[in-house]
């Protein structure tokens, strides 16, 4: 599973220079069902990008904890979580329109009213649309590991990005990551352990067991049968 976001490159002073994409945009062909969902359900559940902070109470029509998922793929897990947690509001970001269409179709079939989706650069959304200290959780599941050394800078989990995420989390909010690439898990752990203002929720200060809140995907189950590992990391904003 490859999730899709955009990661900026920063200089030594933390200034954004040019954007390094952590994905290759391959839109693919929309199925009839995906196109139908985009046509019919985007006006209800879709959120257009705008460079101004969003009002979550107005967006969802109620006040409730907000969970942001970055790169939801086809939306299977996101829809499952939203259906299982009606007391929470969910906002998903995905740059590939077939995935957005599939998610909208599943969400409509499930009768969800606590889910909204965006089709845009996740970093821009975080920077410009998400109010500071507004999120209860940020989820990043199975992002592209960019396993070749020359591509490591494309990985979304870098020090400036985790600082940006922290600024959007409430104190006590959690950044939850999962990957099936051990080297990327080690990279995530190194970056997060070096970031100020986070507390690792692992008792051993490394990885946590998969929480029940993160559904097992078909992809993950297949990997387990093949003996592949999966690493979950959960870090709480403490200040």
Swiss-Prot record:
Residues that span the membrane, as ranges:
none
According to the UniProt record, what class of enzyme is this?
A: transferase
- Describe the reaction catalysed, as an equation: guanosine(46) in tRNA + S-adenosyl-L-methionine = N(7)-methylguanosine(46) in tRNA + S-adenosyl-L-homocysteine
What Gene Ontology cellular-component terms does the record carry? tRNA methyltransferase complex
Cysteine disulfide partners in this protein: none
Active site residues according to the UniProt entry? 144
Molecular function, one GO term: tRNA (guanine(46)-N7)-methyltransferase activity
Q: Which UniProt keywords apply?
A: Methyltransferase, S-adenosyl-L-methionine, Transferase, tRNA processing
Q: Which residues form the signal peptide?
A: none
- Binding residue positions for S-adenosyl-L-methionine: 69, 94, 121, 144
User: Do you know which InterPro entries this protein is assigned to?
Assistant: SAM-dependent_MTases_sf, tRNA_(Gua-N-7)_MeTrfase_Trmb, tRNA_methyltr_TrmB_bact
Ranges for the region named Interaction with RNA are 150-155
Query: What pathway does the annotation place this protein in?
Result: tRNA modification; N(7)-methylguanine-tRNA biosynthesis
Does the record's keyword annotation contain Hydrolase? no
Q: What is its EC number?
A: 2.1.1.33
**A Pfam family of this chain:** Methyltransf_4
**Annotated residues for binding of substrate:** 148, 180, 217-220
What's the subunit arrangement here? Answer: Monomer.
Q: Which NCBIfam families match?
A: tRNA (guanosine(46)-N7)-methyltransferase TrmB
Concerning PANTHER family, the annotation shows: 3-DEOXY-D-MANNO-OCTULOSONIC-ACID TRANSFERASE/TRNA GUANINE-N 7 - -METHYLTRANSFERASE, PENTACOTRIPEPTIDE-REPEAT REGION OF PRORP DOMAIN-CONTAINING PROTEIN
Sequence similarity = Belongs to the class I-like SAM-binding methyltransferase superfamily. TrmB family.
Q: What does this protein do?
A: Catalyzes the formation of N(7)-methylguanine at position 46 (m7G46) in tRNA.
**What is the protein name stated in its UniProt record?**
tRNA (guanine-N(7)-)-methyltransferase
What is the primary gene name for this protein? trmB
């Amino acid at each position: 599973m490859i999730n899709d976001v955009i990661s900026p490159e920063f200089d030594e002073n933390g200034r954004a220079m040019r954007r390094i994409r952590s994905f290759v945009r391959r839109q693919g062909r929309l199925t009839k069902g995906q196109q139908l969902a985009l046509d019919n359900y985007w006006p209800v559940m879709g959120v257009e990008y705008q460079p101004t902070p969003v009002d979550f109470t107005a967006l969802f029509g109620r006040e409730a904890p907000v969970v942001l998922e970055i790169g939801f793929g086809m939306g299977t897990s996101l829809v499952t979580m939203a259906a299982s947690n009606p007391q929470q509001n969910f906002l998903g970001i995905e740059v590939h329109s077939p995935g957005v269409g599939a998610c909208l179709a599943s969400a409509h079939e499930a009768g969800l009213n606590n889910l909204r989706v965006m089709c845009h650069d996740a970093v821009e959304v975080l920077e410009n649309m998400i109010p500071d200290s507004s999120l209860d959780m940020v989820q990043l599941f199975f992002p592209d590991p960019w396993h070749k050394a020359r591509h490591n800078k494309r990985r979304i989990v870098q020090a400036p990005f985790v600082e940006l995420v922290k600024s959007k989390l409430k104190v006590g909010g959690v950044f939850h990551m999962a990957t099936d690439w051990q080297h990327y898990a080690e990279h995530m752990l190194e970056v997060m352990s070096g970031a100020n203002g986070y507390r690792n929720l692992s008792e051993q200060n490394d990885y946590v067991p998969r929480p029940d809140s993160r559904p097992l995907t078909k992809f993950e189950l297949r990997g387990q049968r093949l003996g592949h590992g999966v690493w979950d990391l959960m870090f709480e904003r403490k200040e």
